[in-house]
Amino acid sequence: MKKFFVTAAFPYVNGYLHLGHLVTYIKAEITARYKKMRGYDVLFPMGFHATGAPIYAAAYKVSIGDPKQIETLKKMGIKDIEKFKDPAYWVEYFSKAAKEDLSKLGFMIEWERSFTTVFNKPFHKFVEWQYHRLREKGYIYRGAHPIVWDPKVNMVIGDHDRPDDYAGIRPIEGVIIKFYSKDLDAYLPAFTLRPETVFGVVNIWVNPETEYVLAKVKKVFYVYELYSLYKKFGRLPLNIENRDKLEKLIQDYNNLLDRLKQYEKGIDLIAHAEEIAYKPKEEFVKELKEFAEKEGIKIEEKDIELLYEYYNTKVETQEEKWILPNTIVIEELKNQDFEIEIIGKIDKLIKTLAENPVTKELVPVLPAKFVDPEVGTGIVMSVPSHAPYDYVGLLDLIKTELKEFAEQALKNVRPVVKVEGFSEMPAKDIVESMNITSQEERDKLEKATQRLYSKEFYHGVLTEHAQQFQGLPVKEAKMKIAEYLMENGYGYIYYTLPVRFKSRYGNKVVVKLVKGQWFIKYSDKQWKELAHKAVENMKFYPPQVKELIKEKIDWYDDWAFTHQKELGTALPWDPKWVIESLSDSTIYTAYYTIAHILQHPEKYNIDWDKLTIDVFDYVFLGKGDPKEIAKKTGISEEILKEMRNQFEYWYPVDIRFSAQDLIANHLVFYIFHHVAIFPESKWPRGIAVSGFVTVNGEKMSKSKGNFITIREAIQRYGRDAVRLAAAYAGNAELVDQNIDLEFMEKAKNEIIPRIESYLDMEGYDRDENSLDKWIVNRIRLYFKKLEEYYENIRPRDVINEFFKLENDFNFYRALVLEKPHKRAIEYFKKAVKALWPIIPHVVREPAWIGKEEPDEPWIRVGQYVDQVIKDLANTLKLVRISMARNVSHRLADLVKLYYEGAKLTEEEKEEIREFIEWKPVRIKIIYKNPSEFDILRDIIPYIEKVFGGKVVLELASESKEEKAKRAKEFKPAFVIE
């Protein structure tokens, strides 16, 4: 018996499971049952995810009496609100509820292997082991990094800690360029993603509806940021004193890191040095010496002093006056080590002049509503030759009292980037081609900006106006010019968000430059190559997911994988940090293989504290001697071997089910971590992804009344109706998966009872005719199609195929005058039972017909019979119309209208009753091919019952009828008498 291991992205247990969860889970459930039906040994486990901020935040809100959170719980029908002050109770309550809901639906989940990701020591030990191994391979480091941050609660905001609409939004890197205004005796710091266009600035934009303030500003560079800059540019491009000395310090630090890599605890020494860097130098040196001696690390005192100097290094710039919007921008600057003191408000900003630091030209400050005062610095430089927003903004200003300024700005326009297919003013070209007439046309302007930026970035070259950078490709010049600006004191590398949003705590988020943060090196080229190798050998449903994942593998840079003040697994070597929710759920599928043992220590006599790295190394990697490990840990050799065998038997995962929104993060991490830790034979084999879920064609929303939990749906419609509707929502495709509540109602009242009735049918023991052979072969074709649909995760197609077969079978029953052959009934019951993966409570037991290939000629019998009956019915209509015409044209027209479905009055129906009820005395069917005889003979009883008259069959070649000439192969002619 072959094994088959099915997993699905486990649910986050901060509420009841809803229909959105079910759309993904039903596909996993159907696949698991299908494989079981086909004889596989199937494992389908399910755990519960609770890592991160959402539960922590919700419990906190309950503890402070937040009315909105309390009302949310009450609407769920929860009465004992007090208990929800405790995050552990949230996890316990909703994981139990999720298990109940999926169990009521009859999911074949092996609950013995269930677990939660928090308050669960064996799982924490497993995650710790994973990160020790990643660190050992050099994929973990500490540094400064821009992350999304909630400044009110001082927490990193990951994808699970924000509204779903903002998942995937990351900090973007740009440059602040300082334009000095003599009028204001202050700098206007303009944020740009395109520093190479600074040579084409004709004005500065500010938002006229925003309050701007004057502030004292000083930038502080801590060692981590200095190190990041050095890493990016290979030197320190800063206008600071002692730059050479700082560069040498960083070089010496790098060399020391390389030397320490030979020691198993070398990285721990560096981490410890950082932890105690705040202590006096003598104490620092003494403590680090002791640590090195204890771990057997050879390090000289001068190297320890180097570490002390390195971790206590920071550089401050000279204080300057800046103009800033009085918005969240100031908070974001502070979180990136800008010291800011607000002096006062700015009364007049529009029409003042500022100097371009590169060209030394004076440019005016002008108003533009498109400037977002909460993004970047709330101040933007205007380059109308290359920015559609800027060009349209100036056109709009020409219509105002600032016409003179706008016209002069447009006269000063110069091309900075040359790109084939555009004039010297590419922005003007694209604005006119897209017929953009106002800065209010945001969507069109965004598309124009993206299109032009992409074209110029990949194909553009700098013109003579770019001074010493003339001739450089844009993609090369961008960072060189950023480096030039920083080196000359004209600007800084800076991070912001493309759009401002709120965290689940309800606060606006910023980009923070976190120091001492822990990162995973997803930027590592060799690691990316391994991930790509895995992808090439995997199956994806639908196939286009493959390219999306490959793009994301290439796109990912290093990832901040630790947060603070959250639920989860503490980082083993730095426990003040917690491994965040996407990063602890990467290889948990391996934990399923042993969870039934580790989650039940009383049964297997396991002390969770003894779950060492050696235990997991043996179980998952086959390293070490189980006898020795048993002696050290007290875990019996037998249990160790059983865990190893369980992993070896079940792994790898044969197919993983997930939702479209997890392509960009979880599924990419899932692949990265598997290839880093496990041998190639244990890499994932397949991934199935479904599109976004809608209910009645709309996104689920409580305000729309279409947000329905699984338990509500079961209570309202019944479990198999819910399963059927969830399966019918869609295939594994990147299109909306729509749960139709009308279909669910119909499933409850019509479809399910109808299917149940089929299982009670009985057949007749009579001679088999051509119609019986047709339906048996039609059912064989059904099974062939079902195999394709089940294998390719297409449950909607499975159901539709059944509906088609159902129509054909009912047609067959009618043709045989409700006396179906017992073999046909036997086959049809198997066809119904093949729906066991979808509706197991109705079907009760599965069935499959094996490898019986359909006979194509017999399949065509049904189509032939259907066409004969339609042609005969049409012929009889024409005869009746002709009979009516012999009486009057009016009656003929009424008969024709009747057959076309027109509404007639009762009087009109009475007038034509004799014609529409007329039945022939005899119907002669003239066929051309002798092979048609048996089929036509077998449908004579049906024709005589439905159409009346006696049916006579004649071979065209033997017929004396004039119409015999009209008979064609498998298209008989009719003579009506």
Swiss-Prot record:
The keyword Aminoacyl-tRNA synthetase applies. GO terms for molecular function: aminoacyl-tRNA deacylase activity; ATP binding; leucine-tRNA ligase activity. Keywords: Aminoacyl-tRNA synthetase, ATP-binding, Cytoplasm, Ligase, Nucleotide-binding, Protein biosynthesis. The lineage of its organism: Archaea, Nanobdellota, Candidatus Nanoarchaeia, Nanoarchaeales, Nanoarchaeaceae. Its EC number is 6.1.1.4. It comes from Nanoarchaeum equitans (strain Kin4-M). Residues 220-318 are annotated as: Insert. A motif ('KMSKS' region) lies at residues 699-703. This is Leucine--tRNA ligase. Belongs to the class-I aminoacyl-tRNA synthetase family.
